[in-house]
From Swiss-Prot:
Keywords: DNA-binding, Nucleus, Transcription, Transcription regulation. Residues 185-195 have a biased composition (Basic and acidic residues). Residues 29-115 form the PNT domain. It comes from Pan troglodytes. The lineage of its organism: Eukaryota, Metazoa, Chordata, Craniata, Vertebrata. Transcriptional activator that may play a role in regulating epithelial cell differentiation and proliferation. May act as a repressor for a specific subset of ETS/AP-1-responsive genes, and as a modulator of the nuclear response to mitogen-activated protein kinase signaling cascades. Binds to DNA sequences containing the consensus nucleotide core sequence GGAA. Involved in regulation of TNFRSF10B/DR5 expression through Ets-binding sequences on the TNFRSF10B/DR5 promoter. The gene is EHF. The keyword Transmembrane does not apply. GO terms for molecular function: DNA-binding transcription factor activity, RNA polymerase II-specific; sequence-specific double-stranded DNA binding. InterPro entries: EHF_SAM_Pointed_dom, Ets_dom, ETS_fam, Pointed_dom, SAM/pointed_sf, WH-like_DNA-bd_sf, WH_DNA-bd_sf. Residues 207-289 bind DNA. This is ETS homologous factor. The keyword Nucleus applies.
Length: 300
């Protein structure tokens, strides 16, 4: 038994901690699995309890925040829920996603163990109770602070790498030091570099969701009646056929179950990056932010 920071931690040495995700509660709230919390967003729930749709949202978030080409992560290989995802080894991630598998594996391990992209967000003053006597954890890890989504200490790691070499075998992740995981046989075996995929920092084909939306607006003849400008000079636009746009995006991402509800949730990731803005009080209406490029009439 370990007493630290006003908390109690009971550890059974007979259990394998690699497969026992921790469960945190803070001084304000407690989230129980039986309370129906499974309907939340992916960053509010421990990865083991994600639905397959939350798994896809996590994958899309990694694509967008790391400026990866869509071909780096084949969504059809991840038609699984969080429990299955958490059981995958590094070798299985690499087999499913090529060289991007190491990024996915490292990010997932960090989320499983820390719940935030910056470990100092968990202060020792929190009341922590971790019980690992049973094979199935009884409490879901919740994250109340959404700022970790764009934490510069983690989210920008890949941006610091040469964009031409990211999707190769040597991907350096700074999160390794945070993982309480010894080198496994799977890590030792993973030596052969899979096929390359390429990253384009400014992709005119709409690799990222906001670019996809922009390109529909810029080419109305190819996709008529889907989205229209409300105020071109201000970058304000409206979805006319929201579900049709979602299906088109799902086809591009090999995700046949894409809906506008999921697409709109993905669009929220661009708010903090000031690429998209929400127009209050107007349904289906959005605006390009100051960091969006290529939508202005006189822009090169």
């Amino acid at each position: 038994m370990i007493l630290e920071g006003g908390g109690v931690m009971n550890l059974n040495p007979g259990n394998n901690l690699l497969h026992q995700p921790p469960a945190w509660t803070d001084s304000y709230s407690t989230c129980n699995v039986s309370s129906g919390f499974f309907g939340g967003q992916w960053h509010e729930i421990h990865p083991q309890y994600w639905t397959k749709y939350q798994v896809w949202e996590w994958l899309q978030h990694l694509l967008d925040t790391n400026q990866l080409d869509a071909s780096c992560i084949p969504f059809q290989e991840f038609d699984i829920n969080g429990e299955h995802l958490c059981s995958m080894s590094l070798q299985e991630f690499t087999r499913a996603a090529g060289t991007a598998g190491q990024l996915l594996y490292s990010n997932l391990q960090h989320l499983k163990w820390n719940g935030q992209c910056s470990s100092d967000l968990f202060q020792s003053t929190h009341n922590v109770i971790v019980k690992t006597e049973q094979t199935e954890p009884s409490i879901v890890n919740t994250w109340k602070d959404e700022n970790y989504l764009y934490d510069t200490n983690y989210g920008s790691t890949v941006d610091l790498l040469d964009s031409k070499t990211f999707c190769r075998a040597q991907i350096s992740m700074t999160t390794t030091s945070h993982l309480p995981v010894a080198e496994s046989p799977d890590m030792k075996k993973e030596q052969d570099p899979p096929a390359k995929c390429h990253t384009k920092k400014h992709n005119p084909r709409g690799t990222h969701l906001w670019e996809f939306i922009r390109d529909i607006l810029l080419n109305p003849d190819k996709n008529p009646g889907l989205i229209k400008w409300e105020d071109r000079s201000e970058g304000v636009f409206r979805f006319l056929k929201s579900e049709a746009v979602a299906q088109l995006w799902g086809k591009k991402k090999n995700n046949s179950s894409m809906t506008y509800e999921k697409l709109s949730r993905a669009m929220r990731y661009y708010y903090k990056r000031e690429i998209l803005e929400r127009v209050d009080g107007r349904r289906l209406v959005y605006k390009f932010g100051k960091n969006a490029r290529g939508w202005r009439e006189n822009e090169n």
